[in-house]
């Protein structure tokens, strides 16, 4: 049980996909201008990353390894992610049309989010079992969502703050992301994996 708790805390805080591994920076910078879109993107990404991790582990364990098709792993995972994203898009369109309009082009772009493919590939490379793969995917998504929501809240405050002209816009956003990364480095001694 403690192994799963350490995996969760380690993935969310210590080895955060955005601030430590630098995966998923495109949606991190692109969707984080408003808190509500960041929350929606975080929820959609959480669903996709968790489901994609589970499906990728199942396909790798039951199809690719037994048939000795490991060289097709990346292609198979990209196809799995595309199917999961299409399923998520249909669910979001039916359940929340407002969120669907707010996310706009970013929802289909989850397919190309390197964090989703990264979590699927890292699951296999780290040798996780089924439960660890599901938890790792969920934890990575929770960490991604946490950072995205925190960053969106900070960016909303920065939008009305008196920022010097050369630092307005993306410049202050990158500085803020760097400071967040430094803050998350404080968790580095928390969990030893």
Swiss-Prot record:
Which biological process, per GO, is one annotated for this protein? electron transport chain
Task: Fetch the InterPro entries from UniProt.
Answer: Ion_transpt_RnfA/RsxA (IPR011293), NqrDE/RnfAE (IPR003667), NqrDE/RnfAE_oxidrdctase (IPR050133)
How does the protein's chain sit in the membrane according to the entry?
Answer: Multi-pass membrane protein
- E.C. designation(s): 7.-.-.-
Q: Where in the cell is it found?
A: Cell inner membrane
Any one Pfam family match given in the protein's UniProt record, by short name: Rnf-Nqr
| Topological domains annotated Cytoplasmic | 26-38, 84-101, 155-170
For this UniProt entry, which segments traverse the membrane? 5-25, 39-59, 63-83, 102-122, 134-154, 171-191
Spell out which residues lie on the membrane's Periplasmic side: 1-4, 60-62, 123-133, 192-193
User: Is Transmembrane helix a UniProt keyword of this protein?
Assistant: yes
Ordered alphabetically, the record's keywords are: Cell inner membrane, Cell membrane, Electron transport, Membrane, Translocase, Transmembrane, Transmembrane helix, Transport
Main location class:
membrane
Cellular component annotations (GO), alphabetically ordered? oxidoreductase complex; plasma membrane; plasma membrane protein complex
- What's this chain's function? Part of a membrane-bound complex that couples electron transfer with translocation of ions across the membrane. Required to maintain the reduced state of SoxR. Probably transfers electron from NAD(P)H to SoxR.
The record's listing under HAMAP family reads: RsxA_RnfA
Complexes and interactors = The complex is composed of six subunits: RsxA, RsxB, RsxC, RsxD, RsxE and RsxG.
Instruction: Show the NCBIfam families listed in the entry.
Output: PRK05151.1, rnfA
The similarity comment for this entry is: Belongs to the NqrDE/RnfAE family.
This chain belongs to the protein called: Ion-translocating oxidoreductase complex subunit A
């Amino acid at each position: 049980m403690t192994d799963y708790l350490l995996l969760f805390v380690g993935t969310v805080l210590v080895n955060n996909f955005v601030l430590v591994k630098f995966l998923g920076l495109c949606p991190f910078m692109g969707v984080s201008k408003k808190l509500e879109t960041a929350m929606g993107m975080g929820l959609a990404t959480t669903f996709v990353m968790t489901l994609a991790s589970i499906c990728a582990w199942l396909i790798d364990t039951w199809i690719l390894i037994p048939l000795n098709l490991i060289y097709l792993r990346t292609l198979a995972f990209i196809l799995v992610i595309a199917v999961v994203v299409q399923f998520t898009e249909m669910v979001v369109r039916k359940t929340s049309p407002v969120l669907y309009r707010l996310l706009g082009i970013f929802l289909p772009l989850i397919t190309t989010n390197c964090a989703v493919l990264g979590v699927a590939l890292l699951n296999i490379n780290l040798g996780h079992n089924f439960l660890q793969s599901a938890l790792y995917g969920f934890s990575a998504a929770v960490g991604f969502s946490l950072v995205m929501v925190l960053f969106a809240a900070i960016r909303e405050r920065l939008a009305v703050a008196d920022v010097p002209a050369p630092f307005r816009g993306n410049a202050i956003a990158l500085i803020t992301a760097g400071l967040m990364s430094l803050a998350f480095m404080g968790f580095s001694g928390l969990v030893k994996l």
